[in-house]
Amino acid sequence: MSTAAIPTDAAVQAAIAEARARLADGSMRIRMAYEGHPATSTVLKGRAHLVDETIHRLWRACAMPADVALLAVGGYGRGELFPCSDVDLMVLLPDTADDAMQARLSVLLGALWDVGLEIGHSARTVAEAIDAAEQDITVQTNLLESRLLEGNRPLFEEFCRRYRALLDVRVFFKAKQLEQEKRYARYNDTPYALEPNCKESPGGLRDLQMLGWIARAAGLGRNWRDLARRRLITGAEARDLRSIERFLQHVRIRLHYLTGRSEDRLLFDYQERLASALGIEATAAKRASEVFMQRYYVNAKKVTQTNTILLQNYGVEIFPRRAGAAIVINERFQAVRELLDMREDDTFARHPSALLECFLILQQRSELKGMTARTLRALWLNRKRINAAFRADPHNRELFVAILQQKRGIVHEFRRMNQYGILSGYLPSWRRIVGQMQHDLFHVYTVDQHIMMVLRNMRRFTMGEHAHEYPLMAQLIMAFDRHWLLYVAALFHDIAKGRGGDHSKLGTIDAREFCEHHHLAREDADLVVWLVEHHLTMSHVAQKEDTSDPAVIGRFADTVGTERRLTALYLLTHADIRGTSPKVWNGWKGKLLEDLFFATRRLLRGATPQEALGLDDRQENARALLRYHGLRPGVEDALWAQLDAVYFMRHSAEEIAWHSRTLYYRPDALEPVVKARVSDADQGVQVMVFTRDQKDLFVRLTGFFGRLGFSILDAKVHTTRHGYALDSFMLQDPGNAEHYRDVITLIEHELTERLKKSAPPDRPSAGRLSRQVKHFPITPRVSILPDESGRHYILSLTAADRRGLLFAVAEVLAQNGIVLHTAKIATLGERVEDTFLLSGNGLSQDARVVKIERELLQRLHI
């Protein structure tokens, strides 16, 4: 390596100071120019040029050897830099770096960091660079657009020759396809998340970049116009892509400026300000952020459409093979290279019904892997042929029902129909929910994508490969005659979202109209409409009402009416909750629904309310479990004599046996007994507390759990006949299951000691509100109403979830002398909807109730 005089530290520091000032001044000028006249090139090209100049100065100031080459790689190599993007560099060495060279590189890289650049770098010989590219597709991609910044041009040209020799376009194409599939999977295969990543999510900038990389690697072109000239896309598609690319670039530029960092997620916190920065205004019906996000979704959808078409066309270019004879399917379609192809360019114009028929053919012919690019393009361009006359055509109605009735491909084809605008054409109500955001803080998808997730879940219940995940669901749906009706209910259950009013009621109008137009039998139509109207009922009863109360089960059974309706509603409810967000479903909710399902089914099959709840069976099964654990008959009698029927109704046989094993020999325990275990739902920890009843006990228990950071999923408060509290809690640990043994030990020891000492209640910290709640605040609601028996009162509250919330409620109730019997905690993402069964003097007095409600609201407001 050549040796040049190493500059003095003072000279380097002076160069750094000057470069830092120039970079800051240049960055400010670029931003001002962009704000004055927003053009993406002002930032992307301008910042890349500014960084080029900075690097040139520092390279010279550090007197780097002439035989070394400095390359810009990645996006910077392409000559584009977003405001806060990393600057990716590769130092190309003629030989392995010695100590002197390492020292010079350290000075240069240190200088680049000191001026304020975020540097990503590597230092390699040509052989090392080629080897790294062979081993890692990410490195290979990064080097695809490399350009020489400084230094040894012959060395750079040697690297370019060897890189081109290495590049196998076929391998590169397949690797990038696989990479995209994995990336899509990380984002649940949808661009319609409520907080998408504008760079990495499906339909984001990365999709466009990937199309560019493959085109460049295959020599197909360097921009969208080149691809249009090669007829890989149309001129209109090229213009659309450039327009969409600019939109996404504007979004990312604004996001970087707004956050001051390389942030690519469109978080709720930023959406309103981004809309303002982009000049997007609110409408009478939608806030500016919603208008902005719908525009984002429309553009992301177009990107994914064109991505599919272009990748297919790339494949034809990269893997040329003799076109085999097309296999004729019917007058309208043929199979070409395992893809469905229209036989004539005007197929959809001459045969509009083919707009639905093509999806049915894909379902019926498993050898077909998709549609040809020209068919997909024509599908999109002809989507508006689906009009009132099309929808009224009996043949088209038969085709749509046939698609729903197929044994395979239902989810794939409905997603494709949604992607290409066919579903919006055929179901006019669907248009209103495409890209519609949901600000309820537990749905993480737009309305149309949530429905697709529910449809997917329902479909999975029927598939053998998923039976181990949902064994009961699989058993029920396979015994359910005409289960395609459940798919219809799934399609319509949320179709009236966002119209104002009760979407469950409004949706029945659309569902009834669909059923009548498609000639569903009266019984089937009634089932679909009933499911749409009641799709929230089972979730409400299971999570908010006392399902150990025979009256609650009786009312729910009256609402359901038949076992067929019950089964259908159970399947839809399960699929619906799982389709809201990966975080909303848990095993505890599954158990609540399952218990309600079986109790109601027994009642519908003729059991008495007591038999339906399994009270006698529960005691018998609990005794059997005690015998199984080696306890002799009758040891439980002393304890059970102190427990009333309410206790046995509210606990499962397994819980009763667990309590009994722990307490049978000490029903008059002098000291508190605390036992904990991992729940059988594998979702947290069950805790049992047995101690002499005392004032503020529930407040102390909730304070203790709140201080440890546990969420209380369920609480059952019981007082025995001899004055002991036997309280049960289901807790969700904010950590993970790996340390449950330590958690159980901590709870049993520390809580026992605190109860022994009659220590004052722990005051859990209020906890911080999530950013979602800050952006979409939840107005607390509280109501206290008598139950139907007139013996108890039901407190219902809705509020933003936070640590210590249940403690605050318990404290207000205790201060007012109110006795709490059960607590049902329904956590829906960032929102809680809790229900408490109460009793106490004064609850029959309106003034007293108003006072308690006011105090609760004061504690719930943050």
UniProtKB/Swiss-Prot annotation:
Its EC number is 2.7.7.59, 3.1.4.-. The gene is glnD. Residues 329-685 are annotated as: Uridylyl-removing. It comes from Aromatoleum aromaticum (strain DSM 19018 / LMG 30748 / EbN1). This is Bifunctional uridylyltransferase/uridylyl-removing enzyme. One of its GO terms (molecular function) is [protein-PII] uridylyltransferase activity. PANTHER family: BIFUNCTIONAL URIDYLYLTRANSFERASE/URIDYLYL-REMOVING ENZYME, BIFUNCTIONAL URIDYLYLTRANSFERASE_URIDYLYL-REMOVING ENZYME. Keywords: Hydrolase, Magnesium, Multifunctional enzyme, Nucleotidyltransferase, Repeat, Transferase. It catalyses: [protein-PII]-L-tyrosine + UTP = [protein-PII]-uridylyl-L-tyrosine + diphosphate; [protein-PII]-uridylyl-L-tyrosine + H2O = [protein-PII]-L-tyrosine + UMP + H(+). Pfam families: GlnD_UR_UTase (PF08335), HD (PF01966). InterPro entries: ACT-like_dom_sf, ACT_dom, HD/PDEase_dom, HD_domain, NT_sf, PII_UdlTrfase/GS_AdlTrfase, UTase/UR.
